[in-house]
């Protein structure tokens, strides 16, 4: 007979003392929830034994459970051939006061076969202990063994509680002390629990023992597989009490709740910007460090976010899975489709308190506010130029690097931005999707339409501090300022000639290349400048560029305009 619970020594405890074993028939009697509970309890018990330093080697049962196999398959060295069936009423004679379920009794009898049961000759038709006197010795041995087992079972619940209390108490204390005794040899990272280290090691080994039967995707943690399965079932057990939105992960709900509180606990030490998610702060920090860990294998381009790389890859594939139900236009990103839909609805939720201008996206409002504040947080390390948007800085950097990833299939012209290529293609197609409601004039750029509308309003919000001259475009003001500074930052590598505008340099380069992308549909003549093509078209239409008020003569040649003006004014 074992001693009282207090006399149990932790050093002699084994995993089999806290494990239950099932046959195939018994295992099939359990429903899915019970099977999952069994797996979780057995794995937790083993982790607890490992934690207190009792389990020397991993049992086959644990390996089996970790791999998602059925536990009744496991070969156990303690198991021997099944003895003749012990009927339930005979077991009740042995344990008259217990009343355990039949299958559990069989588990107990099977687990403790070592007590001489291999020689047990139980008559099939025994109905009571009195009829089995001939087997008294064998019975006594079995009875003693099962009495010992009975005491173990009666103590099991209390023992497990004490054991869990012991192990959880120690784990809880470690949480407060911050002690991390378990170190990864691969990367030096430390953990306070051995089970956490074991999970971490799978990152280095690439081991993913938990596989989804539905789609075959594998994970290195059982909890990740459980969460993944909700994608197939559509289960979202975590619901926001504030707005009713549901999530399939508790962490997603926790993150979502911060939206309602407005709290932003994660602050950037570099610039002071705050975020409601630690992941967003991590991504933001890459702006300052310039780190881009996600690289495209197709073109070598690197990104600071994995989601941006995923979206970029679609460019190479040409895939556009997100289609607008309103107009049929397709997009490579769902976020772009969401933004596009606002064109049809006309919704603009985000309003500037400074000037009243409204925007369909919060990010656009944030960027717009920098016009009023003059803030330019994104600075180029190469030349010191600062920008209001990180994307503008990224594009600017390509000037120094000379990178042009996006090539036109029609004329082979290359661009540093995909949006520039899209705009350029409209030269070949003649597409002008942006139309003025006031006069009907159409443009191939939304920015051109915005600028054009100012003609009707007469608004000139961009004023030069040097001379007071006002402009309807910020870009025009920037170009104008160069007049005062005399700066010519755009230099031709071919001949050394410098220009104060990048567009002038682009046009100039065509002299060296001989390129003439602007072709007249009427006569086929080609030009290297769109403005020259527009003037040329007037030859066919008969339109005159300039007509003085003092005479009836008109000029269709821009070179003669100055001479006409002087002649009309009576100058020599």
Swiss-Prot record:
<dbReference type="Pfam" id="PF01352">
    <property type="entry name" value="KRAB"/>
</dbReference>
<dbReference type="Pfam" id="PF00096">
    <property type="entry name" value="zf-C2H2"/>
</dbReference>
<keyword id="KW-0862">Zinc</keyword>
<dbReference type="GO" id="GO:0000981">
    <property type="term" value="F:DNA-binding transcription factor activity, RNA polymerase II-specific"/>
</dbReference>
<feature type="zinc finger region" description="C2H2-type 10">
    <location>
        <begin position="434"/>
        <end position="456"/>
    </location>
</feature>
<feature type="zinc finger region" description="C2H2-type 12">
    <location>
        <begin position="490"/>
        <end position="512"/>
    </location>
</feature>
<dbReference type="GO" id="GO:0008270">
    <property type="term" value="F:zinc ion binding"/>
</dbReference>
<feature type="zinc finger region" description="C2H2-type 2">
    <location>
        <begin position="210"/>
        <end position="232"/>
    </location>
</feature>
<keyword id="KW-0539">Nucleus</keyword>
<protein>
    <recommendedName>
        <fullName>Zinc finger protein 98</fullName>
    </recommendedName>
</protein>
<dbReference type="InterPro" id="IPR013087">
    <property type="entry name" value="Znf_C2H2_type"/>
</dbReference>
<keyword id="KW-0804">Transcription</keyword>
<dbReference type="InterPro" id="IPR001909">
    <property type="entry name" value="KRAB"/>
</dbReference>
<dbReference type="GO" id="GO:0000978">
    <property type="term" value="F:RNA polymerase II cis-regulatory region sequence-specific DNA binding"/>
</dbReference>
<keyword id="KW-0863">Zinc-finger</keyword>
<feature type="zinc finger region" description="C2H2-type 3">
    <location>
        <begin position="238"/>
        <end position="260"/>
    </location>
</feature>
<feature type="zinc finger region" description="C2H2-type 13">
    <location>
        <begin position="518"/>
        <end position="540"/>
    </location>
</feature>
<keyword id="KW-0479">Metal-binding</keyword>
<keyword id="KW-0677">Repeat</keyword>
<feature type="zinc finger region" description="C2H2-type 8">
    <location>
        <begin position="378"/>
        <end position="400"/>
    </location>
</feature>
<dbReference type="InterPro" id="IPR036236">
    <property type="entry name" value="Znf_C2H2_sf"/>
</dbReference>
<feature type="zinc finger region" description="C2H2-type 6">
    <location>
        <begin position="322"/>
        <end position="344"/>
    </location>
</feature>
<feature type="zinc finger region" description="C2H2-type 11">
    <location>
        <begin position="462"/>
        <end position="484"/>
    </location>
</feature>
<feature type="zinc finger region" description="C2H2-type 5">
    <location>
        <begin position="294"/>
        <end position="316"/>
    </location>
</feature>
<feature type="zinc finger region" description="C2H2-type 4">
    <location>
        <begin position="266"/>
        <end position="288"/>
    </location>
</feature>
<dbReference type="GO" id="GO:0006355">
    <property type="term" value="P:regulation of DNA-templated transcription"/>
</dbReference>
<feature type="zinc finger region" description="C2H2-type 1">
    <location>
        <begin position="182"/>
        <end position="204"/>
    </location>
</feature>
<comment type="function">
    <text>May be involved in transcriptional regulation.</text>
</comment>
<feature type="domain" description="KRAB">
    <location>
        <begin position="13"/>
        <end position="84"/>
    </location>
</feature>
<feature type="zinc finger region" description="C2H2-type 7">
    <location>
        <begin position="350"/>
        <end position="372"/>
    </location>
</feature>
<comment type="similarity">
    <text>Belongs to the krueppel C2H2-type zinc-finger protein family.</text>
</comment>
<dbReference type="GO" id="GO:0005634">
    <property type="term" value="C:nucleus"/>
</dbReference>
<feature type="zinc finger region" description="C2H2-type 9">
    <location>
        <begin position="406"/>
        <end position="428"/>
    </location>
</feature>
<keyword id="KW-0805">Transcription regulation</keyword>
<dbReference type="InterPro" id="IPR036051">
    <property type="entry name" value="KRAB_dom_sf"/>
</dbReference>
<keyword id="KW-0238">DNA-binding</keyword>
